[in-house]
Swiss-Prot record:
Molecular-function GO term, any one: structural constituent of ribosome
Keyword Ribosomal protein: yes
Provenance organism: Caenorhabditis elegans
Gene that encodes the chain: mrpl-51
Name the record gives this protein: Large ribosomal subunit protein mL51
Gene Ontology CC: one annotated term: mitochondrial ribosome
Coiled coil location: none
Length: 199
């Protein structure tokens, strides 16, 4: 009788110790910290053979007298012309007289993309048609493959919008986003049209 109870007890201990390694139970454990219950340590007992940045100290040769190579110190002029005028046009639409739009000052962006409202406001079709209207002749002459891929993409998107997204385009037209006389200098979200000036 004692041997049976002892073997049963050892089997229970063995199964519980094995279950301790795997946490697959659907019953939530009672822990003192919620993050601790979700933290799974999958690298226990693993020795990292590479340098962990921020964890391990920097590799140094012991008793080495050569100083660590560092870039030469540069004296930076905090009041240089470039630093002093940084961000001067950020609020020109609020503080200016309204004659200059902030999109016209985005010199780091391509000309055809300045002030474009983005993929969440304007769709890809409008952007590609605008690009094609500006660079159609140059693309056809210099890179015919890119020109062909652009035409294919526009054709596919036109089919998609004509058959699948008619309600969306109709809603945009009803919002008044499509003006008869669009502004060609920049693509503002309030002035969008398929008709664009060809340079």
């Amino acid at each position: 009788m004692n041997s049976n109870s002892l073997s049963r007890f050892t089997s229970i201990v063995r199964t519980t110790s094995i279950r301790g390694f795997h946490d697959r139970s659907s019953v939530p454990r009672v822990v003192d910290d919620r993050e601790k219950s979700s933290a799974k340590y999958n690298d226990a007992g693993y020795t990292f053979r590479y340098h962990q940045q921020g964890v391990d100290p920097l590799p140094r040769i012991p008793d080495c007298k050569v100083p660590v190579a560092r870039p030469a110190y540069k004296v930076r002029d905090q009041w240089s012309d470039e630093a002093a005028r940084f961000g001067q046009n950020d609020y020109i639409d609020l503080l200016g007289d309204g004659s200059v739009h902030p999109a016209q000052l985005q010199y780091h962006t391509p000309t055809w993309l300045r002030g474009f409202p983005g993929q969440h406001k304007a769709n890809e079709l409008i952007k590609l048609i605008h690009y094609r209207n500006l660079y159609d002749a140059k693309l056809k002459q210099n890179s015919p493959k890119r020109w062909h891929e652009l035409r294919k993409r526009i054709k596919y998107l036109m089919m998609q919008h004509n058959y699948n997204k008619q309600d969306e385009i109709g809603r945009e037209r009803n919002l008044g986003l499509w003006e008869e006389e669009p502004d060609y200098t920049y693509k503002d979200k309030s002035r969008r049209s398929f008709k664009d000036e060809i340079h």
